[in-house]
């Protein structure tokens, strides 16, 4: 039996970008641990099927929240939906993220060089990896501060520790998310709200990338990750369980690299 501090039964969790991938993995574990969850995505077919799948498997109340959380009105709609359904938010997981593998500036002398990021692509990468977390934290924060209780978990990336080839803007956003985590944690520390981050390494998802690409990613991870394998989506959920529970009450402002040793 786990210590009581790990018990999150009855907690209300809001997870962005949770229709698939890491967000879905987090939702599955937290629901298994007894939490009721609002999972957000912009694509109805992913978020609705994921909500139904997790609800059927765990018996918990899982609701889909379809909204663009990179925009203020979308965030407000999402938070209003969660508050109407559950009356509170105990844990916010800012998981939304995406990368475009292109350089900031086209690299000369490379026959296969990718084109530089366009203005629209640059804005997209910053919005989904950083702006979303800021907007959602701003919207949920007043509810947590009023109750003097809450957990915010930001999902960063291993690239925040050492950069990522042809992913400069993505790295900028994920590194800024680490700074945001530290600054917001300090500002809210005296109000009983903890803010921490997880920086995942390589976690292939066949649903997101397709079976073949996920297999290739796993093979690459076996070569370059010190622990010799890619991560499993569930493993991010297990760490999120710790950060969502009272077991982590004395931790705030920290970023935990869950990357099989890639950041060493």
Question: Where are each of the predicted segments found?
Answer:
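C-terminal substrate-recognition "lid" of short-chain dehydrogenase/reductases
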Residues: 15, 149, 229-258, 263
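Conserved glycine-rich cofactor-binding loop
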Residues: 12, 17-21
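Short, small/polar-rich loop/turn modules that mediate ligand/substrate recognition or access, typified
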Residues: 189, 194, 251-253
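A glycine/serine/threonine-rich, flexible loop-to-helix segment
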Residues: 4, 52, 105-112, 190, ...
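Active-site helix of classical SDR
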Residues: 137, 173, 181
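Catalytic Tyr-X3-Lys loop
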Residues: 98, 111-134, 149, 153, ...
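Conserved mid-core segment of classical short-chain dehydrogenase/reductases
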Residues: 76, 84, 99-123, 146, ...
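Alpha-helical segment proximal to the catalytic Tyr-Lys
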Residues: 142, 186-187, 249
């Amino acid at each position: 039996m786990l210590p009581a501090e790990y018990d999150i039964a009855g907690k209300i969790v809001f997870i962005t970008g949770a229709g698939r991938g890491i967000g879905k993995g987090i939702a599955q574990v937290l629901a298994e641990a007894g939490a009721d969850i609002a999972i957000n995505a912009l694509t109805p077919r992913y978020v609705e099927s994921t909500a139904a799948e997790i609800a059927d498997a765990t018996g918990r109340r899982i609701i889909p929240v379809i909204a663009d959380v990179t925009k203020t009105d979308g965030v407000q709609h999402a938070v209003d939906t969660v508050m109407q359904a559950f009356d509170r938010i105990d844990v916010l997981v800012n998981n939304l993220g995406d990368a475009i593998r292109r350089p900031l500036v086209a690299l000369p002398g490379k026959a296969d060089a990718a084109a530089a990021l366009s203005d629209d692509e640059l804005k997209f990468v910053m919005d989904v990896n950083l702006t979303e977390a800021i907007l959602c934290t701003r919207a949920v924060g007043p509810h947590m501060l009023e109750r003097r209780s809450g957990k915010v978990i930001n999902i960063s990336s291993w690239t925040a520790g050492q950069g990522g080839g042809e992913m400069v803007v993505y790295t900028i956003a994920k590194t800024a998310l680490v700074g945001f985590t530290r600054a917001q944690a300090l500002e809210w520390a005296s109000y009983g709200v903890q803010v921490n981050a997880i920086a995942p390494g390589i976690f292939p998802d066949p649903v997101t990338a397709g079976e073949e690409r996920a297999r290739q990613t796993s093979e690459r991870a076996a070569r370059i990750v010190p622990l010799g394998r890619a991560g499993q989506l569930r493993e991010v959920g297990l760490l999120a369980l710790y950060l969502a529970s009272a077991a982590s009450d004395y931790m705030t402002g920290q970023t935990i690299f869950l990357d099989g040793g890639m950041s060493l």
